[in-house]
């Protein structure tokens, strides 16, 4: 008879312990319910990129001296620089400059080592397309400045703050 009583007592203790664990986990869940969300609704809300963000490369054709330093420092020899030598003035004349962003790793070496600062990184990071050949930007496409996320009234921008406010 005693083993049966101790079995019921042991069963009761296990039930109380299980109920306590369930209650503790429920309290933890409720404590997280009043916190602000960490995620954002991406297409409609965007984070403002940091100052040193490495996005699409912007190219200024008039500043380039066709020295090809960008090609030499690129780990994958990506920028394509076409030039011809003007013998009368003894200078290189830039004909074409292109970068294929389907291959680019956005390391920023070309921007860092450019002696004339004709290359710069923009805040544009949405380069997706259905055709990979559209990612090959020539000097005209590289010269376009991206539309700023801050000026777009259809997108709510969120500053780099520790917590995101919800509406």
From Swiss-Prot:
[4Fe-4S] cluster 2 binds at residues 74, 104, 107, 110. Keywords: 4Fe-4S, Chloroplast, Iron, Iron-sulfur, Membrane, Metal-binding, NAD, NADP, Plastid, Plastoquinone, Quinone, Repeat, Thylakoid, Translocase. PROSITE patterns: 4FE4S_FER_1, 4FE4S_FER_2. It is found in: Plastid, Chloroplast thylakoid membrane. Its cofactor is [4Fe-4S] cluster. One of its GO terms (cellular component) is chloroplast thylakoid membrane. Belongs to the complex I 23 kDa subunit family. This is NAD(P)H-quinone oxidoreductase subunit I, chloroplastic. It comes from Vitis vinifera (Grape). The gene is ndhI.
């Amino acid at each position: 008879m005693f083993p049966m009583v101790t079995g019921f007592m042991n069963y009761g203790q296990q039930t109380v312990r299980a109920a306590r664990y369930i209650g503790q986990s429920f309290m933890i869940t409720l404590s997280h319910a009043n916190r602000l969300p960490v995620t954002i609704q991406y297409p409609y809300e965007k984070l403002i990129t940091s100052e040193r963000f490495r996005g699409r490369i912007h190219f200024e054709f008039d500043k380039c001296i066709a020295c090809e330093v960008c090609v030499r420092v690129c780990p994958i020899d990506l920028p394509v620089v076409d030039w011809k030598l003007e013998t009368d003035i003894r200078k290189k004349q830039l004909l074409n400059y292109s970068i294929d962003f389907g291959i680019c790793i956005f390391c920023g070496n070309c921007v860092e080592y450019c002696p004339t600062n004709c290359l710069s990184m923009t805040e544009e990071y949405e380069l997706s397309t259905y055709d990979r050949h559209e990612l090959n930007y020539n000097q005209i496409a590289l010269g376009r400045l991206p539309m700023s996320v801050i000026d777009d009234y259809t997108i709510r921008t969120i500053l780099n703050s520790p917590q995101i406010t919800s509406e």
